[in-house]
Amino acid sequence: MSRQQQDRGEVSAQVVLVTPVIILLLVIAIQAGLYFHTSSIAGAAAAEGAAAASVVRASREVTAWRGQQAAQNLVIEAGGRTTSAAVVAVNTATVAITVVVRVPRIIPFFPSSVRRTVIEPRERFTTELAR
């Protein structure tokens, strides 16, 4: 028997063994991309909400509402889905906003949501003499 006849069918066996591994790696790469994209959306939404809430000179409820609305609008515009309303903590010096965005899942062992928190100082208006 010649060498070519002995090696027949070896390539198809290799393809059958390697193809699932390549597909699994491709799916993991896609899931990782979705996770990092969602993480970017959550961070941007938290920053936008904190920035919107930090410039409001109103009651804490109005400040929190403005921050929530700004964060929610950015998540919707970017195509993400929040798991709950943004949580805004307002005190006299800072505004902290936490946004949780759901990650689209292809495979089960990746996290199902991303949480990002941004703390921003509140704007303070001072007189010229107080500077």
Q: Which residues does each predicted region cover?
A:
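Residues in flexible loops and secondary-structure boundaries
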Residues: 25, 44, 61, 95, ...
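Alpha-helical assembly-interface signal, strongest on the long, hydrophobic N-terminal helix that forms
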Residues: 1-68
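Extracytoplasmic/periplasmic mature domains of Sec-exported, cell-envelope-associated bacterial proteins
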Residues: 29, 59-60, 81, 104, ...
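Low-complexity, S/T/G/P-rich flexible repeat/linker segments used as non-globular hinges
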Residues: 105-131
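Short amphipathic secondary-structure patches
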Residues: 48-102, 129
